[in-house]
Amino acid sequence: MLYPLARHFLFKLNPEQAHDLSIKYLPRLLGTPLDCFFRHSLPKRPVTVMGLSFANPVGLAAGLDKDGECIDAFGAMGFGFIEVGTVTPRPQSGNDKPRLFRVIPAEGIINRMGFNNKGVDHLVAQVKKAKYQGVIGINIGKNKDTPIEQGKDDYLICMDKVYDQAGYIAVNISSPNTPGLRSLQYGDALDELLAALKVRQQELAAQYKKYVPLAVKIAPDLTPDEINQVAASLIKNGIDGVIATNTTLERDMIYDMPHAAEAGGLSGRPLQHKSTEVIRQLAKALDGALPIIGVGGIDSAMAAREKLAAGASLVQIYSGFIYKGPDLVKEIVTHI
């Protein structure tokens, strides 16, 4: 695999340039002799979660393909599912640049992207065009300029528009880069949002004559009591799954490393243990009521197995994929 060579080139660019270049050119390599460098034929590891059939339990986490423009290329790498987004009702440019930083000594990434995306209508058009046969999750959020009190409306708008094209819908209430968003994870605000989403899910299921599961993505920076409260709310409102976790605001693991003082969410290896502990606590609180998709610092088959042992049914990768490349998918699926 030539990824180490590609990484050497990409890491000479700033992180956002490298990302944009990859998203632009990867689809163009499909169907050419060069796609042999990332196309994988992997062993089947079928699993059924949230009523959906996955060819294997390894997925691409949201954030890498925000606008769904690279689905088939990522699919060729062997992912059992691909989560696109986060997408918002209206296009938005996100936060000021620079907003993406590599913490290379720790194989971590700090981002404060701010839900930059081309809007939900563009994303849905891209998903419709995709030939990928696996499960596509669509991660939805709210626009930055939508008051938090009206945030529920943005989620419902997105849900209406993506429902017919989504394998499952992921509700992102845990990004640290949209002001006030994480407040939706607590108490009455969470209950009110989940209740509204559940009602709309039932309406859309009747309209389209199919049931699309809802999964909620949570932060790692929750206390044990908060994890218990989130679990109770998920069960109470009949949510189908939970994604644990998003990025962390903590910096203890990288305090003396380059970019440690940058604002934003930290992902990658520094998040590995913290996210696994949240999964372990969450699994205990849920007691099998709904499945967990584990994400956070997975950079090896062993790290993936730790997430599964802690209580996850599926896993997702992002930062580990940036550092290790497509062979990481093959390693995890083969040795999980």
Swiss-Prot record:
It is an enzyme of class 1 (oxidoreductase). The active site is at 175 (nucleophile). Keywords: Cell membrane, Flavoprotein, FMN, Membrane, Oxidoreductase, Pyrimidine biosynthesis. It is a peripheral membrane protein. It catalyses: (S)-dihydroorotate + a quinone = orotate + a quinol. It holds the Pfam family DHO_dh. Its cofactor is FMN. FMN binds at residues 62-66, 86, 139, 172, 217, 245, 268, 297, 318-319. Substrate binds at residues 66, 111-115, 172, 177, 246-247. InterPro entries: Aldolase_TIM, DHO_dehydrogenase, Dihydroorotate_DH_1_2, Dihydroorotate_DH_2, Dihydroorotate_DH_cat, Dihydroorotate_DH_CS. It comes from the Bacteria. Pathway: Pyrimidine metabolism; UMP biosynthesis via de novo pathway; orotate from (S)-dihydroorotate (quinone route): step 1/1. PROSITE patterns: DHODEHASE_1, DHODEHASE_2. Monomer. Belongs to the dihydroorotate dehydrogenase family. Type 2 subfamily. This is Dihydroorotate dehydrogenase (quinone). It comes from Aeromonas hydrophila subsp. hydrophila (strain ATCC 7966 / DSM 30187 / BCRC 13018 / CCUG 14551 / JCM 1027 / KCTC 2358 / NCIMB 9240 / NCTC 8049). The lineage of its organism: Bacteria, Pseudomonadati, Pseudomonadota, Gammaproteobacteria, Aeromonadales. The gene is pyrD.
